[in-house]
Amino acid sequence: MAHKKGAGSTKNGRDSKPKMLGVKRFAGEKVNSGTIIVRQRGTHIHPGENVGLGRDYTIFATCEGVVKFEPTTNDRRKVSVVAD
């Protein structure tokens, strides 16, 4: 048996923590102002009415209402909040 660990096992053994990206509030859900709707890297989903876009492309509600996803041109999606 080898008495050394070998190059592979000593250089492995680390991983980055999960980033928790994705849709946090789905279509039809009620949200308050400031609620995070989507966490993303880049604008996979674009902001629509009554939502804001953060520095890290997080989409959040700017008013109280119901989440609505809708298609736009060129296979893009847009998320809006429809006020009650």
From Swiss-Prot:
Which HAMAP family did the record assign?
A: Ribosomal_bL27
Q: Which GO terms describe its molecular function?
A: structural constituent of ribosome
A Pfam family matched by this chain, by name?
Answer: Ribosomal_L27
Q: Where is this region: Disordered?
A: 1-21
PANTHER family per record: LARGE RIBOSOMAL SUBUNIT PROTEIN BL27M, RIBOSOMAL PROTEIN L27
**Which GO terms fall under biological process for this protein?**
translation
Q: Name one GO cellular component term.
A: ribosome
Is the keyword Ribonucleoprotein in the record?
yes
Identify the stretch annotated as signal peptide in this record.
none
Entry keyword Amino-acid biosynthesis: no
Query: Which keywords does UniProt give here?
Result: Ribonucleoprotein, Ribosomal protein
Q: Which organism is it from?
A: Dehalococcoides mccartyi (strain ATCC BAA-2100 / JCM 16839 / KCTC 5957 / BAV1)
Return the similarity comment: Belongs to the bacterial ribosomal protein bL27 family.
Q: What is the name listed in the Swiss-Prot or TrEMBL entry for this protein?
A: Large ribosomal subunit protein bL27
